[in-house]
A protein has these predicted regions:
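Membrane-embedded alpha-helical bundles of multi-pass transporters/translocases
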Residues: 2-523
Length: 523
């Protein structure tokens, strides 16, 4: 039995019948299926996005493996892309009464449990080869298979849920809010406030590797269970009304080869624009997020001069996350009214222009917490439409492709989208690691005089005050990664998105889709 038949038979068991009965999108589906459930399912991944690289660097010490720390995340992108394309094909070739994407949420749940546990069971004793193999296999099991199995299906849900533009906009807003909230709560509240000193135990100015490793193993059990729970909750509280249309009309769907879907997408300029938007925008966000814990730990004097730098950096990181999260929270309410008034494309472009200007504020003083926090708020305000509206724009593009091609390309498109959202994480970690390594990053910092910044070579015999900080090259890398990268990508995206005019085709596309369905059903 192949995987698509297995997914169909599994989903059509009575126990896996959706709890959503209404033909219209209602509160339980909105609140649970598109916010609470994905929030839980993506919670662990949000923490990994902010802290997994630091776990590898400071706890497992993978910089001792030389180029491995840089090459693994970058090379793994190949496997992530292949994994997402494979899962996208599974989705497009699955047809069940419970949909074509949702069945893979069931399959993703146990896969996530296994993959997360393996990532944090890396043997710390023994030869380096065993550790490198374990890290490589577990890393790719999570990022190239388990998480894409959920995320590719999850990302398809807005476009498969309904053709009602208003409902789609609301679902896109809530779905993106869940992703943002999981990052805000996980990476900016739970870990920095409650778990920073637990997961990164300090000892003699450095990291207590054994204690930190033990604590990460405990937390991994909680994270894998929360992820699996979120997968199942989203499965039960969502519904694929678009997929049901063809089933109810008895439309016979052929299995679409990858080549046909590829040709149907790559010859359309709107598809390229929206995909390049996600690629560029996400690259800037991930470089920023991956460097945030490093930046807060090493760029603010209040942290460097603290008696407990890890605890202080955790508190400041939490504060920075909360301050930056204020516009994000407000955005849940105002994003769609703004998009209705201006149009989705204009809302995104106008907002990002504001973000570019706001992003320049922090360069008045990159060591000032106040300046950095103010800049984050301004960037957050401007990026509200980009964060909440673009999934609805992607749905419009998918409808436009369906009208032109006569078939939907959700699976392939969302596999590309998922490859970007998941695969870029590893690529950005690799880029950041290579920059930090080249600049001379040290996980304990360099002992120096706090006034003159002169390096103290012999700490044991030095009688003056000592602080541990990174040297100039590392500070420049962190300033670029955390403060400049996203501003640069915003500017590029503004130029790109100004050409996305798919909204003017919406009414014509919906009419054409209905005509195609009637022809296929011989009505």
């Amino acid at each position: 039995m192949n995987i698509t038949n297995f997914a169909k038979k599994l989903a059509e068991k009575p126990v896996f019948k959706t709890r959503i009965k209404s033909d219209q999108v209602k509160l339980s589906e909105i609140a649970i299926g598109y916010f609470l459930a994905p929030f839980c399912a993506m919670f662990a991944n949000a923490i990994f996005g902010a802290y997994l690289n630091r776990y590898y660097v400071d706890v497992l010490g993978w910089t001792k493996f030389g180029a491995f720390a840089t090459l693994l995340p970058i090379v793994s992108v190949i496997f992530v892309v292949l994994g997402n394309l494979m899962i996208g094909q599974w989705i497009d070739n699955t047809r069940s009464t419970q949909g074509k994407a949702r069945p893979y949420m069931i399959i993703a749940a146990p896969m996530l449990i296994i993959a997360i546990i393996l990532m944090f069971m890396t043997p710390t004793k023994g030869n380096n080869a065993v550790q490198m193999i374990w890290i490589a296999v577990s890393y790719n099991m999570y990022y190239a298979l388990a998480y894409p199995c959920f995320y590719c299906a999850h990302s398809s849900m807005v476009s498969l849920s309904t053709r009602n533009s208003e409902s789609r906009g609301l679902l896109a807003t809530l779905s993106n809010a869940a992703m943002v909230a999981s990052a805000g709560v996980g990476a900016s509240i739970v870990v920095p406030i409650l778990l920073q000193s637990f997961l990164f135990v300090t000892k003699e100015g450095g990291i207590d590797v054994d204690a930190s490793y033990s604590h990460w193993r405990i937390i991994s059990i909680v994270l894998c269970l929360v992820s699996a729970f979120g997968c199942m909750l989203e499965y039960y509280f969502t519904r694929e009304r678009i997929t049901e249309e063809t089933i109810n009309l008895n439309v016979k769907e052929e299995k679409l080869p990858l080549k046909k879907q590829l040709e149907g997408c790559i010859h359309n300029k709107y598809w390229w624009i929206i995909i390049l938007y996600f690629l560029i925008f996400q690259f800037g966000q991930l470089i920023k997020n991956s460097s945030m814990s490093f930046y807060v730990r090493w760029m603010f004097d209040s942290v460097i001069n603290s008696a407990n730098p890890e605890q202080t950096s955790g508190a400041l990181m939490s504060t920075l996350g909360l301050v930056g999260g204020i516009p994000t929270a407000v955005g849940m309410v105002v994003a769609w009214p703004i998009a209705r008034k201006l149009g989705k494309k204009r809302a995104v472009v106008t907002g990002l222009c504001f973000s570019v200007v706001g992003g320049l504020v922090c360069f008045l003083n990159v060591h000032s917490f106040g300046m950095v926090a103010a800049s984050m708020v301004l960037k957050g305000i401007g990026s509200i439409p980009a964060m909440y509206v673009t999934m609805a724009l992607l749905s419009d593009v998918l409808d436009h492709l369906e009208a032109k091609n006569g078939f939907r390309s959700d699976g392939f498109t969302m596999s590309v989208y998922s490859s970007i959202m998941v695969g870029l994480s590893g690529l950005c970690i690799g880029v950041l690691n290579s920059l930090l390594t080249f600049a001379g990053y040290s996980n304990t910092g360099i002992a120096c005089n706090p006034q003159t910044l002169e390096i103290v070579e012999n700490v044991a015999n030095y009688t003056g005050q000592i602080v541990y900080r990174q040297m100039g090259g590392v500070e420049q890398v962190l300033a670029f990664a955390f403060l400049a990268a996203d501003v640069i990508t915003y500017a590029v995206v503004i130029i790109l998105m100004s050409r996305l005019d798919v909204e003017k085709h919406i009414e014509e596309d919906q009419k054409k889709i209905k005509e195609n369905q009637k022809k296929a059903a011989n009505i």
